[in-house]
């Protein structure tokens, strides 16, 4: 099934190759179909799923790099961080802006934190 997500992925990968940044680019998408379209085009690429409706085991079976879920999803499913790591997946959480939330997700063991306040986060990491 070829669709607009396949077409978009092809165009994006073409541009990333053109500018020689494909190997340095992480792909994130809310659509699992888009993630799979990128996976076909870049089998060794770093692809993260954003939507938050799939458990880590499902993401692993699809061959993706990891989960990139909102704070609310990971607060509802905190065990997903440990499960993801056991599956060899990476975990990002977004958008974490309060010091309390930063501490919570640092303690939870996420690999990456997306924030609008990087200086706040860096202070928490020291």
Which residues are covered by each model-predicted region?
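Short loop-to-alpha-helix "cap/lid" segments that border enzyme active sites
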Residues: 1-126
């Amino acid at each position: 099934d070829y669709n607009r997500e396949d077409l978009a992925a092809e165009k994006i990968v073409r541009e990333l190759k053109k500018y020689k940044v494909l190997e340095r680019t992480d792909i994130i998408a809310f659509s699992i179909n888009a993630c799979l379209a990128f996976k076909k085009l870049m089998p060794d690429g770093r692809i993260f799923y954003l939507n938050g409706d799939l458990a880590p085991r499902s993401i692993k079976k699809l061959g993706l790099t990891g989960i990139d879920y909102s704070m609310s999803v990971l607060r509802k499913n905190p065990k997903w961080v440990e499960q993801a790591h056991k599956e060899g997946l990476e975990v990002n959480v977004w958008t974490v802006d309060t010091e309390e939330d930063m501490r919570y997700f640092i303690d939870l063991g996420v690999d990456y934190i997306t924030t609008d306040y990087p200086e706040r986060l860096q202070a928490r990491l020291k």
